[in-house]
Amino acid sequence: MACTREDVIEYISNLSVLELSELVKEFEEKFGVSAQPTVVAGAVAAGGAEGGAAAEEKTEFDVVLTDAGPKKINTIKVIRQVTGLGLKEAKEAAENTPTVIKEGVSKEEAEELKKQFEEAGAKVEIK
């Protein structure tokens, strides 16, 4: 029996963040593509001075765990606390760095998350 597009979307919508991340990596490897957004040079040049102002007005940030640090258990606890992931998923996220912990958060929330992770001994980037 063939899967329909709706079946695929339903399956993907039921995946955890970690499972979805692994699926994306498999797609990248199998099809030789990248999930990273591409920048079009013409669009940047056409933006001119407005592009610089837009960069300053960034309101959504991603919190990326780059290193779980020597106290991995503390880092796993923080991951579980801020994401609601289960123990297994949080452990995998801590071991498979870099890992996006939260996406599209405010600067204040991103700074607070960074502080929590650094207190646990982890290294975090805000992008």
Curated annotation (Swiss-Prot):
Domain of life: Bacteria
InterPro entries: Ribosomal_bL12 (IPR000206), Ribosomal_bL12_C (IPR013823), Ribosomal_bL12_C/ClpS-like (IPR014719), Ribosomal_bL12_oligo (IPR008932), Ribosomal_bL12_oligo_N_sf (IPR036235)
Keywords attached to this entry: Ribonucleoprotein, Ribosomal protein
UniProt cross-references to CDD domains, sorted A to Z: Ribosomal_L7_L12 (cd00387)
A Gene Ontology term for the protein's cellular component: cytosolic large ribosomal subunit
Gene Ontology process terms (BP): translation
Molecular function (Gene Ontology), one example: structural constituent of ribosome
Name of a matching Pfam family: Ribosomal_L12
Signal peptide: none
Subunit structure: Homodimer. Part of the ribosomal stalk of the 50S ribosomal subunit. Forms a multimeric L10(L12)X complex, where L10 forms an elongated spine to which 2 to 4 L12 dimers bind in a sequential fashion. Binds GTP-bound translation factors.
Protein's job: Forms part of the ribosomal stalk which helps the ribosome interact with GTP-bound translation factors. Is thus essential for accurate translation.
Family, as annotated: Belongs to the bacterial ribosomal protein bL12 family.
Protein name: Large ribosomal subunit protein bL12
Organism: Nitratiruptor sp. (strain SB155-2)
Name of the gene: rplL
